[in-house]
Amino acid sequence: MSCFDLCRPCGPTPLANSCNEACVRQCQDSRVVIQPSPVVVTLPGPILSSFPQNTLVGSSTSAAVGSILSEEGVPISSGGFGISGLGSRFSGRRCLPC
């Protein structure tokens, strides 16, 4: 690092090396790169809202419960004859309930 001497001479060279003026020495500027430290930013999460509604859903047809269906009040079991048996029983009639 080099410095510049800004002291002025005190006039004619005295026999005793003394001076009453201030003497300042200035050095070159220093450059320092400061990396920013990691910053943690917390973003708020989404706000989930629900609006529950009490709704009744009904049907006028019979519902399937387990493996037993009802056709005109007579219980039908799917065990033994499978879907093909249901098809032959209801062929030509109305659709099966959903």
Curated annotation (Swiss-Prot):
Pfam families: Keratin. InterPro entries: Keratin (IPR003461). GO terms for cellular component: intermediate filament. One of its GO terms (molecular function) is structural constituent of cytoskeleton. Keywords: Keratin. Signal peptide: none annotated. Belongs to the avian keratin family. The avian keratins (F-ker, S-ker, C-ker and B-ker) are a complex mixture of very similar polypeptides. This is Feather keratin 3. It comes from Gallus gallus (Chicken).
